[in-house]
């Protein structure tokens, strides 16, 4: 293959052209990303740099976005495993990362709190370094390798939506690699140890996973099994504005084997082959083989266009190959180099953004390579082929013998590199920053997350950017999914800064787990300059509350004009015959519309459809995977909407001084097209608690009549111009009497990008604008009301609203918890009462655990319909006057009118004043003062009643809120106490275990010490006393013991001799007898034999072994040697003699054969000549005989065919003539009938065709297969003869034997009604069609249900008359069967 010398300049330039490396970047000027928030300077470990200048550098002052100049050349990062710290900043070009001691497998440190784990499947995987992937992840499925009970390899596929699972089998050896084509794909590829390729297409059918094999390429049976095989899909690049993903986009796949790489075009393979599996030897096209490495291939990558393959090998080389599958060109090496000085490579990652590809940014601009199981990573620039940064991973000093074995993977956006260590229970997340303009790419930070087990393989599902608060607005390119608020509270961060949520599936040594990590990375931009606003973020809208998206549907109108007049033409008694006995046959159009009873229900003035406005809430389905599971001990208000009233500004400076916005953002209220109210951002400290927003299920908004649907009580506008921009959120606890709504169309302008105020505070401010005293300002003069193009200062307004009072109290004392405020649209007297009650509730809430500020957005429904209608009219009038006036002095009056008429629950003084002004303007000199006084008294009485009712409602509301708040506090207190008790119990158990461990260690040390002392004592005593005791005992034995024994034993010996002699004689006889019996006993002999055998076995065995080894074996060897020598000599001599005899015999045989061959050859030649002559004669004879026989047979066959053809033609002509005669007879009969009708003076409609033309047209329709149209035309003509003609022409089985029935329900009903008119003639065909038509009626069809009873009742009556009139008819049996069928179908109520 190609070598280093074969690479020329043209090949390298071709690679640069493919990768778009020489393209200018002039158009890319404004794409640099900037962040608003300052970056935390907390470190997760110890940073050691070689240069002193880098030590004093402030982390928050570093511009990480450019990454052009690194602060130091050498940096050592010692990870500590501290979960409470932030991620560590990387500043050096050559960085060494030392693993923490807590990440060791033997360490008992707990996992990180930022990692949320959910078990998916339990299985024991072997802990080793896997070259391929054990798991593959897509948006809908996960697949992982496993083994069955018999040890065979399998792939388990699990659906993420339905939890349905299946097994994929047929794998040889074990699974070496798994991969989906891309995240949105349902094509799963698998490679086994034999190199066989499996590609399945996964689909969901009726809740079950269906696996269809798309490609199965099988290797030969003698293929060497290898675990070093990889799958590389061609990357999927989403198109701009692409919604539906076509799964056939990734049809190119590369397979890496030990010595070669293969690139396959699956589309060509599927086109050429239909059955699977297919042997690789049978495939002739659609693939290409790449060879050129001297070591084992470890990694690879395909370019997005599929024309370049990059391979990394254990020989240390990375090579780029130009490939063309469809052509005949061999792969050509474009470039090669050693990134790690020849060390074996284990990683090859190109830093391309596959989530959102910029067409101006070239592919393969930066490259990450890894060596020695990714213990060393390097970032490369593919333009200059220079190393930009080097990262080295080292073990901790306490376990230096266990080297890291890292698995690395980039997310789709190429912003984060995720690494797991097979030897340690840790996961690293490294943030990658790319600068296309400067040609720099570096790692800017690293985060360490401790796990419970080492990760052997993992698959990244998604990496989302999310805010710390749900109400924060994300940029358009970021995902708007956010994690649960309970999980955000655990992050202990008070800033509304951006965070990252990583979702991945990990294969541990014990289980497969769903892992979710939320952390706050470094901000890749400098702090924004005070007073400078970002243009792209000045205007932002309040987002919809997550999980709730309610849309108003347009009201349904119940008027029906066009169809009523047509329906009225249909008589309800259409089954009754007229006096002239002419049948009134119903056409199929009569059965197309609902019955009269249904029409009356629709057109009734009291109908629900015509009087009610249907409002349908639609809940947006959020991804359940993005919301983390909440801990069971944490409790939130499930029935209240919790909103934070503080507008928090992030502090980019290090000293934490609060900042105030220099501009006043404007809030646009939906429904007031020309009204813009400017609200300044409140200056708040940065220590406010984060927003806690409870996820609520969408509630159905109660339907209301048109007189109530535009009530000004609802905060959102009643206009239907943009209904999708006005979502409503209803609180469950206040559903009976209140409706809470949050307008989503609020737009805030002028907000600085570095200081985002709370969007929910803006919503509360917009709510405040709708209160009666909504124009009061905190800073007196900086909040003008803009109507049209004029500005009116708000110094006219005197009374502050409840929301402003709450904000002022928050500014005075931010440390005290704030109570629940009441509804904003209340009177001045009620507001004063509520302020007092709020202060009392604030004093009672000092000991509360919850320190958040809540606002309850609520509106009251008035029970007085007339007052509500009048309030609505006033509001419409005031809004019309405001929108119609634009300048001059009249604006002041308009604003006052708007203040007084905006809400029906405004202050009595303002209402009284506005009504008085209107009456003064409206009255004329002819109206008396008495009438004015009466009207004023009535108005005052109405106001007093409404105010009293509102006061009672508000008091009841306040009591309910206080009760709920007390219950919530009790629940929170119980939760905290339970949590504290569990923590104390856990700590006590840990201390108890530690004390027990110390005591056990002490006992163990004491036992070891005692054992050591006893051993030393015994050793010293045995050494010192053994010699002395031995000598003393020997001397004493010689001197005293022998003499004493001799003196004592002499008399005893004499006595024993005499007694023994006497007893021996007595016993001798007994012994002889007993011994004789014993010897003759079989058991004794067996026992003696066994004992003798046991005792002699070892001795005899050893003796025989020694004798055999010393005597037999040498003698046997010598004898065998001499014997084999003699045999060898004899064999040689015999072989030589045999060869001589064989040669002589062969020579004699050869001579004899040569003598006999010549005459045989001569005879064979003669026989061949004679055979040729005979063959020629036989050929001529056979040809003549065959020709004559064929002619004879053809003559006979032609004669038979003539006879049969004549008979067939005659029969066909006879049938056609008879059929034509029948048609002619029918035409003549119809002509006569028409002539008779015309003679009677009945006018013939001009639109009707004559009977013959109708028959012809119907016959054409039936010949074309349009059976329904043919029957419909015949039924529409209202002619029974035409209907019977169609029924006789078409067989009933041909019509009703199909499924579904080709005749529609109206046609069936009309056919039944017309055929049942008269059973006197052609009864059989009528009964056959009626039986089949009745059986094919669809009872679920509304038209059939409306008309079936009447039609079938008529058929039953006609059948009954027929049976009574003709009891002896042969068709009585089918008629009775049809009658019984009709009695079962027609209910008694319809008969």
UniProtKB/Swiss-Prot annotation:
Compartment(s): Cytoplasm, P-body; Nucleus
Repeat (WD) residue spans along the chain: 170-210, 226-274, 292-331, 340-390
Spans annotated as Disordered: 703-724, 897-924
Coiled coil as UniProt keyword: yes
Ranges in coiled-coil conformation: 935-968
GO cellular component terms attached to this protein's record: nucleus; P-body
Pfam families listed in its UniProt record: EDC4_C (PF21289), Ge1_WD40 (PF16529)
Annotated Basic and acidic residues bias: 915-924
UniProt keyword annotation of Repeat present: yes
Keywords: Coiled coil, Cytoplasm, Nucleus, Repeat, WD repeat
GO terms under biological process: deadenylation-independent decapping of nuclear-transcribed mRNA
Signal peptide: none
Main location: cytoplasm
Classification via SMART domains: WD40
Family per similarity comment: Belongs to the WD repeat EDC4 family.
Function according to Swiss-Prot or TrEMBL: In the process of mRNA degradation, seems to play a role in mRNA decapping.
Name of the protein in its database record: Enhancer of mRNA-decapping protein 4
């Amino acid at each position: 293959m190609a070598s280093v010398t074969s690479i020329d300049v043209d090949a390298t330039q071709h690679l640069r052209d493919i990768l778009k490396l020489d393209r200018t970047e002039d158009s890319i000027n404004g794409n640099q990303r900037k962040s608003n928030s300052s970056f935390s300077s907390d470190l997760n470990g110890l940073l050691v740099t070689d240069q002193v200048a880098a030590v004093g550098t402030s982390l928050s002052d570093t511009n990480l976005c450019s990454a052009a100049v690194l602060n130091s050349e050498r940096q050592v990062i010692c990870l500590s495993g501290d979960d409470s710290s932030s991620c560590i900043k990387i500043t050096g070009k050559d960085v060494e990362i030392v693993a923490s001691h807590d990440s060791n497998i033997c360490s008992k440190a707990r996992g990180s709190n930022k990692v949320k784990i959910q078990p998916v499947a339990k299985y024991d995987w072997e802990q080793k370094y896997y070259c391929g992937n054990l798991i593959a992840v897509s948006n809908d499925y996960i697949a992982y390798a496993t083994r069955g009970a018999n040890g065979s390899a399998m792939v388990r596929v699990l659906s993420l939506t339905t939890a349905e699972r299946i097994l994929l089998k047929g794998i040889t050896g074990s699974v070496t690699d798994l991969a989906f084509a891309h995240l949105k794909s349902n094509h799963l590829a698998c490679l086994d140890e034999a190199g066989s390729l499996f590609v399945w297409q996964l689909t969901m059918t009726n809740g079950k996973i269906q696996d269809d094999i798309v490609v199965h390429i099988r290797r030969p049976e003698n293929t060497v099994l290898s675990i070093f095989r990889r799958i590389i899909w061609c990357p999927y690049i989403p198109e701009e504005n692409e919604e539906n993903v076509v799964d056939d986009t990734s049809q190119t796949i590369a397979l890496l084997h030990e010595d070669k790489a293969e690139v396959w075009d699956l589309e060509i393979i599927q086109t050429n082959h239909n059955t699977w599996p297919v042997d690789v030897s049978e495939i002739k096209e659609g693939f290409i083989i790449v060879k050129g490495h001297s070591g084992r291939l470890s990694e690879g990558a395909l370019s997005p266009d599929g024309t370049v393959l990059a391979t990394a090998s254990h020989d240390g080389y990375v090579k780029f190959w130009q490939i063309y599958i469809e052509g005949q060109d061999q792969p050509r090496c474009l470039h090669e180099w050693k990134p790690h000085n020849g060390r074996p490579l284990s990683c090859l990652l190109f830093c391309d953004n596959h989530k959102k590809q910029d067409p101006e940014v070239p592919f393969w601009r930066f490259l990450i390579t890894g060596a020695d199981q990714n213990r060393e990573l390097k970032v490369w620039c593919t333009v200059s082929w220079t190393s930009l940064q080097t990262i080295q991973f080292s073990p901790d000093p306490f376990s230096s013998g266990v080297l890291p074995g890292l698995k690395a993977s980039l997310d789709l956006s190429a912003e984060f590199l995720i690494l797991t260590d097979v030897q340690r229970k840790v996961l690293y997340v490294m943030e990658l920053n790319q600068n296309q303009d400067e040609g720099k790419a570096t790692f800017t930070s690293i985060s360490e997350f401790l796990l419970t087990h080492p990760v052997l393989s993992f698959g990244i599902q998604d990496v989302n950017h999310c805010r710390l608060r749900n109400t924060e607005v994300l940029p358009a390119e970021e995902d708007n999914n956010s994690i649960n608020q309970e999980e955000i509270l655990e992050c202990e961060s008070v800033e509304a800064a951006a965070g990252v949520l990583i979702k991945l599936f990990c294969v541990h040594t014990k289980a497969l787990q769903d892992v979710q990590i939320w952390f706050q990375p470094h901000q890749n931009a400098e702090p924004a300059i005070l007073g400078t606003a970002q243009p792209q973020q000045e205007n932002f809208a309040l987002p919809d509350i997550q999980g709730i998206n309610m849309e108003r549907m347009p009201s349904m109108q119940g008027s029906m004009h066009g169809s009523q007049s047509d329906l009225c033409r249909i008589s309800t008694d259409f089954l009754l015959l007229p006096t002239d006995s002419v049948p009134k046959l119903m056409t199929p159009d009569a059965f197309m519309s609902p019955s009269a009873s249904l029409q009356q229900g629709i057109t009734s003035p009291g109908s629900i459809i015509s009087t009610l406005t249907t409002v349908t809430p639609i809940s947006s389905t959020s991804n359940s995977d993005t919301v983390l599971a909440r801990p069971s001990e944490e409790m939130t208000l499930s029935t209240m909407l919790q909103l934070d009233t503080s507008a928090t500004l992030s502090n980019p400076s290090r000293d934490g001084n609060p900042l105030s916005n220099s501009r006043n953002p404007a809030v646009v209220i939906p429904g007031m097209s020309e009204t813009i109210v400017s609200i300044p951002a409140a200056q708040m400290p940065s220590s406010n608690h984060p927003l806690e927003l409870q996820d609520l299920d969408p509630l159905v908004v109660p339907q209301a009549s048109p007189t109530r649907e535009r009530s000004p009580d609802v905060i959102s506008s009643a206009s239907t111009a943009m209904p999708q921009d006005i979502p409503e959120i209803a609180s469950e606890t206040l559903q009976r009497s209140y409706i809470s709504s949050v307008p989503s169309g609020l737009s805030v302008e002028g907000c600085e990008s570095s200081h985002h105020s709370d969007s929910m505070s803006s919503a509360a401010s917009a709510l405040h604008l709708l209160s009666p005293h909504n124009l009061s300002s905190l800073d007196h003069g900086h909040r003008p009301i803009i109507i049209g193009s004029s500005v009116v200062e708000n110094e006219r307004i005197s009374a502050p609203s409840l929301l402003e009072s709450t904000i002022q109290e928050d500014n005075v004392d931010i440390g005290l918890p704030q109570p629940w405020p009441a509804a904003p649209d209340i009177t001045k007297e009620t507001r004063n009462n509520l302020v007092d009650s709020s202060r009392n509730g604030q004093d009672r809430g000092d000991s509360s655990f919850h320190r958040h500020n809540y606002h309850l957005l609520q509106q009251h429904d008035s029970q007085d319909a007339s007052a509500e209608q009048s309030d609505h009219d006033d509001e419409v009038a005031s809004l019309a006057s405001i929108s119609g006036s634009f300048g001059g002095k009249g604006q002041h009056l308009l604003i006052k009118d708007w203040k007084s008429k905006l809400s029906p629950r405004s202050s009595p003084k303002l209402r009284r004043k506005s009504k008085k002004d209107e009456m003064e303007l409206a009255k004329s000199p002819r109206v008396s003062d008495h009438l004015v006084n009466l009207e004023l008294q009535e108005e005052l009485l109405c106001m007093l009643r409404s105010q009293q009712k509102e006061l009672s409602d508000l008091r009841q509301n306040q009591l309910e809120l206080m009760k709920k708040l007390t219950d919530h506090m009790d629940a929170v207190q119980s939760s905290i106490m339970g949590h504290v008790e569990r923590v104390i119990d856990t700590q006590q158990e840990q201390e108890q275990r530690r004390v027990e461990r110390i005591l056990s260690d002490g006992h163990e040390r004491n036992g070891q010490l005692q054992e050591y002392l006893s051993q030393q004592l015994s050793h010293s005593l045995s050494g010192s006393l053994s010699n002395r005791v031995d000598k003393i005992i020997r001397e004493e034995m010689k001197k005293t013991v022998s003499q004493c024994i001799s003196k004592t034993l002499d008399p005893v010996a004499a006595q024993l001799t005499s007694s023994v002699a006497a007893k021996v004689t007595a016993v001798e006889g007994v012994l002889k007898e007993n011994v004789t019996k014993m010897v003759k006993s079989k058991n004794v002999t067996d026992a003696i034999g066994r004992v003798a055998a046991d005792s002699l076995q070892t001795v005899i065995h050893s003796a025989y072994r020694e004798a055999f080894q010393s005597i037999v074996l040498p003698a046997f060897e010598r004898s065998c040697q001499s014997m084999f020598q003699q045999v060898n000599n004899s064999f040689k001599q015999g072989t030589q003699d045999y060869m001589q005899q064989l040669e002589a015999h062969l020579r004699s045989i050869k001579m004899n054969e040569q003598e006999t061959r010549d005459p045989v050859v001569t005879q064979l030649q003669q026989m061949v000549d004679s055979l040729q002559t005979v063959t020629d004669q036989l050929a001529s004879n056979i040809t003549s005989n065959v020709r004559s026989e064929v002619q004879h047979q053809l003559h006979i066959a032609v004669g038979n065919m003539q006879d049969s053809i004549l008979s067939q033609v005659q029969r066909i002509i006879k049938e056609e003539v008879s059929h034509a005669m029948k048609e002619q007879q029918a035409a003549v009969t119809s002509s006569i009938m028409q002539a008779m009708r015309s003679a009677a003076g009945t006018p013939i409609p001009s639109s009707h065709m004559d009977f013959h033309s109708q028959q012809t047209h119907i016959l054409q329709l039936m010949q074309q297969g349009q059976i329904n149209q043919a029957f419909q035309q015949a039924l529409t003509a209202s002619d029974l003869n035409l209907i019977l003609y169609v029924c006789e022409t078409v067989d009933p089985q041909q019509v009703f034997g199909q499924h579904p029935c080709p005749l529609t329900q109206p046609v069936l009903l009309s056919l039944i009604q017309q055929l049942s008119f008269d059973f006197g003639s052609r009864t059989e065909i009528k009964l056959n069609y009626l039986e089949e038509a009745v059986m094919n009626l669809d009872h679920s069809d509304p038209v059939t249900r409306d008309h079936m009873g009447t039609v079938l009742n008529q058929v039953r009556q006609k059948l009954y008359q027929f049976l009574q009139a003709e009891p002896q008819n042969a068709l009585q049996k089918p008629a009775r069967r049809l009658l019984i069928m009709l009695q079962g179908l027609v209910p008694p109520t319809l008969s």
